[in-house]
Amino acid sequence: MPPFAPLHVWRRRWLIRLAFYTFVVLVAVPLAFSQVLLRGAAQPPSAPPPGYVAGSVLSQGLRLRTWTRRGSDARPAVVIVHGLGDSLESYVDRADVFARRGHTVLLLDLRAHGASEGGYTTLGGHEREDVQAAMEALRGEGRAGAGLVLMGHSMGAVAVLRAAVGQPAVRAVVVEAPYDNYRANVFHHAWLLYRLPRWVPIIPITIAIAEWRAGFRADDVDAVRASASFGAPLLAIADGADMRMPEAVVRRVADAHAGPHQVWVAPGAEHVGAILHPDYWRVVLSFLDASGC
């Protein structure tokens, strides 16, 4: 028996190894990373606080949880949408402020979050339909006669911006920490969290796998394009210490807007933390007053 394997045996071994490593880099790792993009945050339902009524809306065959507090039909109804990994419970404090102003308020659990159905999140892709389902529910109940105000945070900000397009009933939109578009957001977070540069092929392959698994088009999820496609007044809030959706990204979304818009930067605020700033409600409510809401 020779001390070394023949050349053709070594060549075959190296080809097998190359095929294995290629599979890992181009298939297995992107498949695992796609789950990071698609992972929601389901949790058991809780009872609504006093004054709120638990309900649901149907979006693309998925049953989504809502909490609604009824107000005056003379005020625009408000839809409040959470961000990635969150649920409607976190936004009751915001809803209470609007309720005290007389607004009907609807809190929504997006798909694959909270107590809503769904296996995947699409970071504002299919979630547009979730927001529009909530809007339609308010219209169906006769609660949107004075129009609608949409408020979204992070992923929810992208969802409400996209949901506002082609909706004349939308009177004003408030967004905090939106990203500009799906691909740019994934590239940014790949570097921020994993130090993966843009040229690494894992990232576009991961996006393609996520598109295939969840049935959406990443290029459709574009908050800048959505902002340019409706004219209702827009308040864009940037969190001053936010590394995920920095001020420059928020301004890019706002500067593209087709109608009146303003940007407020909450100094020192972390991601979706502007509400902790003492000027938060002064800014938000002054904007709504100026918008006739």
Show where each model-derived region lies.
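An N-terminal hydrophobic leader/cap segment in hydrolases
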Residues: 2-58, 64-67
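Conserved alpha/beta-hydrolase
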Residues: 95-117
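Alpha/beta-hydrolase active-site loop
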Residues: 121-142
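Alpha/beta-hydrolase fold nucleophile elbow
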Residues: 142-154
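Hydrolase active-site cap/lid region
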Residues: 163-216, 273
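Short beta-strand/loop motif that positions the catalytic acidic residue
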Residues: 229-231, 236-238
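Conserved alpha/beta-hydrolase "acid-adjacent" motif
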Residues: 243-249
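Catalytic histidine-centered segment of alpha/beta-hydrolase-like enzymes
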Residues: 269-281
